[in-house]
Each structure stands twice: as C-alpha cells, then as structure tokens.
C-alpha cells in the first residue's frame, strides 16, 4: 500500500522526535524515516532558505523514501536557482539505504555546486558489506564532490529539537546513554569510512617524550586479527582509531576514556565464539587504573580474544596505575612500549600521510628504551 504522507511538514511532536531519533544503535519497529533538512547559500551570514521535514517508510518503494522525496522537490526548485551554490544539511533518523546512498552520490556528481552534510541518528544495516561500500563511495572524495556523513551528537539533537520540534520552549532532555550510543556509532562509522588521523594529531599525541604538556587526550588505534590455519589474518573491516570523550565535548557533560569507548564497540563486531582473535591497541597513554581493570575483566571473560597493548607513554606510573597495569598483565594482556616499528606501523596504517614517510622525532628510540625499562619494573612490581 502506498504510504499516505504529506509532502513536507514543518515540525514534529516531541514524542515523535524522541521515539524516532533515539540513537540506540539497534532498534526495532522504527520503520518511519524522518529527514529534517536545511538549504543555505554559501554565504554564512544569510539564514537558511528553506527548512522542513520529509518522511517515508523504510520498506516502501524507493520513490517514497524521504531522501528521494527531497531530491524530487530540490531538483524542481533548483531549476529556478541554477547559478547559486548551496549547502544542504540533513538530520535523519536512519542513514540512507543502499539504493538511496547510490542515488545521492549520482545527484552530487551531476551537480557540483551542491554540497551535502548528513547527520544521522542511527546507521542502517551497518554490518552489511554492500552497504558499507555504498557509504564509502558516497563519502570518500576521490573524483569530485561527495557528501560528508557524521553521527548526530548532543548539539545536533538540540538543534533539531529547537528547529523542527513543537518544543513549546521546553529544553531538550537527552535520553539515557545518548553519549555512549553516539560514541559507538561514531566509531562504527569511522570503521566503515576508514577514517584516517591527520599527521599533526598523530605526531603531537604519540610523541613519547618523558614529560609532555597539554596532552590531555588519549588516542587509541586498533586492529583485529583472526587465527586461520595457525596464521593470524588481519580483518581490514575491524580497524580504526578513537580518542577519549572529554567532559563537555560535543555538548556531553560526562567524559569517557578511550579504552572504555573501545570496549563498548567490541560487542557490535559479533566475534565468532568458535574462532580465536587477537586485538592490538596502540595508545598514546597507557591505561589508567579503572580502564586497566575493565580491560582485564573483558579478556578474562572472553577466552577467545587476546589483547596486545603498545603504549607511547606511561600514564601516572605511581600507585594505583601501576597496580592496574599489573592486573591487566596478569589477566593475559601483553603490554609493551611503542618502538620505532610500532610508530611507523601506526603512521602507515592510521594516518592520512599522503605518501609521506614517517619521520621519527629526536630521542624517539632513547625515550622508548627508558620507558620499556620503567614498564618492566612496574610489571615486575619493583620499587621506584
């Protein structure tokens, strides 16, 4: 049966927004897709030219999907405004399906004066490899304009609440676990799109000098291997990087350490219980006491997963942090200090280096050797 939706609406009810834009990664019975859009010129001083809502059903004919409804409207509207360059922003409850994703890419290729930013509350069929490839084709800028896709964070939810909801001047109240779900989806989208770190971020945060100032973030690069015929085989789709969520970042009041964000995402990989896996992490700081405890619990409960950690620096190697590292090692994790080999591997694998080779900084090997000795003393419970 053809969905009976009006072409556009200007606002939705509060319960409708909270129900359909809930960002829990896996949700059932959310078959209506809501697409809130804004169209602006390239002049940032000018207000949006149009801002409304399309909606459609996930399982209906393609022409009834909200993405296609938008392009049907926009194409006709665009004929009257051919000379202008436009920035289109979508806030959408589900990321576009495979066919819509390909149609979006085609549209943008045919109209280079339009740029599209897509903020999604949830990822649609993120485990499907064909869908992942469609998203990469849409978002990776190889031969022309493409879309930028991001996960909605608190700021985007707040914006939609103010712009597209009958809020009656009530403030947006986030649901439980909104920050955690955001980080999970952010990591998964990064895996799919194969995001890379920019070179200054890597060299600044992974510098292994003994005393560094202003390095308050922890970056964690990871890769996963599966044992096959006594050989470790790299799983390219399970590779990425993340950093800790600092308090108040992206509008979230509470922070979350990088290691805990990483542990949150592993269950969504659905690793086969009958296969053996090796997870390798390259971190700018070794885990704090609490994170080390949680990682130790994880590998103690997941006998088919082994964990290797290479740290650029040792975090607060006094007291409980030392105890945490020992607990983690006793649980079976292999903890080491990054050497030139690991720094180069991270540069080659996780950094958008554009063909530039890794250039070690002064003192890299000396710092690495000193930190390795210090780590061994900690793990062997030797005195300071």
Curated annotation (Swiss-Prot):
Its cofactor is Zn(2+). This is DNA dC->dU-editing enzyme APOBEC-3G. GO terms for biological process: cytidine deamination; cytidine to uridine editing; defense response to virus; DNA cytosine deamination; innate immune response; negative regulation of single stranded viral RNA replication via double stranded DNA intermediate; transposable element silencing. The record marks 244 as: Interaction with DNA. CDD domains: cytidine_deaminase (cd01283). Residues 1-60 are annotated as: Essential for cytoplasmic localization. It catalyses: a 2'-deoxycytidine in single-stranded DNA + H2O + H(+) = a 2'-deoxyuridine in single-stranded DNA + NH4(+). It comes from Gorilla gorilla gorilla (Western lowland gorilla). InterPro entries: APOBEC/CMP_deaminase_Zn-bd, APOBEC_Cyt_Deaminase, CMP_dCMP_dom, Cytidine_deaminase-like. SUPFAM superfamilies: Cytidine deaminase-like (SSF53927). Belongs to the cytidine and deoxycytidylate deaminase family. The active site is at 259 (proton donor). Its EC number is 3.5.4.38. Its main location: cytoplasm. GO terms for molecular function: cytidine deaminase activity; RNA binding; zinc ion binding. Zn(2+) 1 binds at residues 65, 97, 100. Residues 209-336 are annotated as: Necessary for homooligomerization. Residues 29-138, 214-328 form the CMP/dCMP-type deaminase domain. Keywords: Antiviral defense, Cytoplasm, Hydrolase, Immunity, Innate immunity, Metal-binding, Nucleus, Phosphoprotein, Repeat, Zinc. The CMP/dCMP deaminase domain 1 mediates RNA binding, RNA-dependent oligomerization and virion incorporation whereas the CMP/dCMP deaminase domain 2 confers deoxycytidine deaminase activity and substrate sequence specificity. Zn(2+) 2 binds at residues 257, 288, 291. Residues 213-215, 313-320 are annotated as: Interaction with DNA. Homodimer. Homooligomer. Can bind RNA to form ribonucleoprotein complexes of high-molecular-mass (HMM) or low-molecular-mass (LMM). HMM is inactive and heterogeneous in protein composition because of binding nonselectively to cellular RNAs, which in turn are associated with variety of cellular proteins. The LMM form which is enzymatically active has few or no RNAs associated. Its ability to form homooligomer is distinct from its ability to assemble into HMM. Interacts with APOBEC3B, APOBEC3F, MOV10, AGO2, EIF4E, EIF4ENIF1, DCP2 and DDX6 in an RNA-dependent manner. Pfam families: NAD2.
